[in-house]
């Protein structure tokens, strides 16, 4: 089978590999229908994910059809269409029992697929701990509707949940990339008083304006003044930082009102400064909103009910045979790209 593979720093290639086989009674084999490219895949390509193993098939955003299951797999069976969770988790340790599956203590736990073991930009993938890692897609939900459930949409849903958004809040979302838009969609479910999106790209601001016309828009240079002019208490009640740029962490806490919650969803390439003397007296609560795949079943239900739709994010579609081209477009942000669906021919 064809598999897009991490050869070495700066080099991914589509190569031939053997179809995976079950290695444990808790495994499942999934025939990949659709996969997608994530910025984390680019981090692997650039060598900034030390735990990534050269030789692995990359990709952790995927949906597919269950081909085979181990004897201890529950909840799914061959023939089921499923989402695949980016996180591998046991469901039994302290963190899993408390809903923090991102911090699973199993040796297999955490980000394994497409990082430490073969992932989904291929034709077939082995999913460890499949009872927890697979969710059946409802019959009236398409593969494209479900494509982002296991990663970028799970991130946005978790971030909105831990931000404790109320209907009286002004919510500021910094960044309108794929994760930022998924975070926006999930924040909208909370029905806050207003949502402001800060994004430097005119192209992406126009995307938000087209699809979410009730959202207020600003740029990083104008954000501080804009938020103060469009909030009730001298700043945003909830700030969700999804950009991860050099200046956006500082912008996030500066735009927050006193006693606000600032949720950091973004990953940073370098250390950030927490200037406590500058923010003394603001009494801010900081939270981090990394991927936590504990809500995938609920997210699928919301998609089924028509309350979440991420299909507008799919701006491009490519067969697996042209995945090099897809990566070039995604990495260089060409042609208005937001997300790319990779399908098997």
Place the predicted regions along the sequence by residue:
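Cysteine-cluster motifs in flexible loop/terminal segments that predominantly coordinate metals
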Residues: 38, 85-135, 139
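Glycine-rich beta-strand-centered segment in the early N-terminal region that forms part
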Residues: 20-35, 48-97, 138-141
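Short, flexible surface segments
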Residues: 75-78, 167, 258
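C-terminal hydrophobic helical "lid"/dimerization subdomain
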Residues: 1, 200, 225-226, 250-254, ...
């Amino acid at each position: 089978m064809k598999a897009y593979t991490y050869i070495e720093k700066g080099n991914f290639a589509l190569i031939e590999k053997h179809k995976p086989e079950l290695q444990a009674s808790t495994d499942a084999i999934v025939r990949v229908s659709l996969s997608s490219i994530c910025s984390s895949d680019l981090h692997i390509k650039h060598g900034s994910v030390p735990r990534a193993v050269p030789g692995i098939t990359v990709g952790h955003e995927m949906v597919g059809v269950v081909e085979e299951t181990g004897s201890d797999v529950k909840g799914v069976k061959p023939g089921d269409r499923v989402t695949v969770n980016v996180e591998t988790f046991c469901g039994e340790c302290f963190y899993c029992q408390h809903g923090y599956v991102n911090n699973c203590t199993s040796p297999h736990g955490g980000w394994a697929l497409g990082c430490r073991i073969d992932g989904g930009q291929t034709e077939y993938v082995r999913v460890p701990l499949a009872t927890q890692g697979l969710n059946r897609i409802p019959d009236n939900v398409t593969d494209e509707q479900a494509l982002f459930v296991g990663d970028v949409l799970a991130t946005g849903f978790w971030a909105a949940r831990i931000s404790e958004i109320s209907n009286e809040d002004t919510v500021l979302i910094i960044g309108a990339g794929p994760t930022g838009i998924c975070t926006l969609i999930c924040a909208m479910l909370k029905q806050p008083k207003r949502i402001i999106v800060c994004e430097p790209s005119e192209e992406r601001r126009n995307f938000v304006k087209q699809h979410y016309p009730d959202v207020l828009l600003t740029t990083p240079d104008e954000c501080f003044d804009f938020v103060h002019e469009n909030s009730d208490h001298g700043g945003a009640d909830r700030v969700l930082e999804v950009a991860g740029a050099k200046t956006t962490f500082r912008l996030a806490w500066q735009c927050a009102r006193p006693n606000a919650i600032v949720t950091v969803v973004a990953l940073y390439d370098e250390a950030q400064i927490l200037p406590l003397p500058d923010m003394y007296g603001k009494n801010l609560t900081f939270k981090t909103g990394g991927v936590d795949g504990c809500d995938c079943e609920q997210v699928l239900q919301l998609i089924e009910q028509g309350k979440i739709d991420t299909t507008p994010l799919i701006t491009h579609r490519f067969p697996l045979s042209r995945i090099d081209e897809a990566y070039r477009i995604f990495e260089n942000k060409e042609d208005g790209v937001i997300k790319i669906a990779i399908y098997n021919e």
